[in-house]
Amino acid sequence: MQQLFGVGRGTMREALKALEVQGLIRLTTGPSGGAVIERVTFDRTFQFLQNYLFFEDITIGDMYALRTILEPEMAALAVPHLGEKEFDALERSIAMSDPREENIQPAAVQRIEDLHFHDILADACPNPLLRFQCRLINRMLETMVVSALHATQEEHRRLGEASWKAHRQILAAARDADVSQVRKLMLAHIVENQRHLDLLQSGLRRRLVLDSDLRLGGAPLPQVRPMRAPAPRTRKGA
């Protein structure tokens, strides 16, 4: 490779290391060692995107504006590619997010499973770009929604019940291979979810203001947007 590119050993070593950091290759040692091409994983790609997204003012509303467009089509495209393996995974996800008291899971588990249901469908979608976009939004929502778990528990319960019911309906339509019904149900589900999450945000804002008022004994602090990425910090003396 040094001869092929006309570079020295040090330059080649640095180039290979850069490719390894990006997840494009895996370096092995030993007599039969060398560089092996690796498939870049979704998790690694998301880590890189986080560096960009950290400086963007992205809200729940921004993400749901995309979800209402992407998710119904993603689910519809996935239907012909769902087999028993996918149906079993969807059933398990629904069971994990069951809101009935005898089967209740912690709020964090329920919210993550709500999104995992959508990831299972996305993985079956034959359109790789649509699949990636849906999974990217789900991963961002996972962080934002879990960060609001200390908002009103009543709203979390309502969100869980609505999602559980919608997921059961979507799964039933998918088993019947009813593509148009899956698309319709998914759109209704996303719209309803946004309404519940808007209430969660509102409840969290009220709670933050009330807590601050009680601690400070003065006027409430200005309303904040708790689900926005914080601004980067600078070190003193930098």
Language-model regions, residue ranges each:
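Short linear motifs at protein or domain termini
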Residues: 1-70, 76, 80, 205-207, ...
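Hydrophobic alpha-helical elements and their junctions with loops/disorder across both membrane
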Residues: 22, 82-85, 200
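Short, solvent-exposed segments of well-ordered alpha helices
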Residues: 54-61, 108, 154-157
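C-terminal all-alpha effector/ligand-binding and dimerization domain
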Residues: 140-238
